[in-house]
């Protein structure tokens, strides 16, 4: 076969998608293909979905005359990314503790003994934005995902900041804050709850965003306050890693302009902050780039 390709996979709690990416140029070689992910299913159902992804990728590789030379997965956490083992008690519970690379080898679908990489989803997002997106012209960068939850990743000195399992250095979502944890105050549900406490109305974050854009002062303050809280709680990370750029993804990033100034003011240090440029494609672009980065830095 001709070109070498990376099988880039974005595996979430409820869906999974893949694409083939050039190992040389990191250009996308195929369109994205989507599958439902049976998060609460049996081991057989979950592994069957992974098998469908691998079989689909092999079929695509034959169509475009390329060889799959590595695989790279963006995954939720907690996850042992070094060994490819899910540690999640709720999502994919039936494969908790299972070594996925060994399962893939036993399927005998992909070429044998190709390298397989796993990357926490916030890191996949960060690498995508660092190589191809909003942070491309910066060095030390902090990636933040705000959606149903809260996650951060650090890119410093041309590499990811990783813990012993290959995960993000900081689990700021569970930092104690006020009457709970930080995620209670910086997330989609935090926006809903803050607005409800003042107005008595139960709206989702998108509705509150629209209200803010239409002049609702309470809605605008809710977003500004979230930006301030986030900025104050990441300032120590920014200082420790000499961060010069912050890039924010996740669903709440779609309202980024409503809290950007408050975030930057709270962080200080002249740090620049951007909303995601790549949006839903950041993770797959990121894991493909990470695969090449790892191969070059063995």
Question: Model-found features: residue ranges?
Answer:
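Glycine-rich phosphate-binding loop and adjoining helix at the ATP-binding site
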Residues: 39-40, 47-51, 66-71, 77-140, ...
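Glycine-rich phosphate-binding/hydrolytic loop that grips phosphoryl groups
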Residues: 6, 117-130, 258-298
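Adenine-nucleotide phosphate-binding core of ATP-dependent small-molecule kinases
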Residues: 38-64, 179-181, 192-258, 272-283
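Stable alpha-helical structural segments in soluble proteins, enriched in small hydrophobic residues
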Residues: 53, 57-61, 126, 134, ...
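Glycine/GP-enriched mid-protein hinge/lid loop-to-helix segment characteristic of carbohydrate kinases
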Residues: 5, 19-21, 30, 42, ...
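Conserved phosphate-binding loops in N-terminal lobes of ATP-dependent enzymes
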Residues: 3, 7-75, 82
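A short acidic Gly-Thr/Ser loop motif
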Residues: 9-15, 144-149, 251
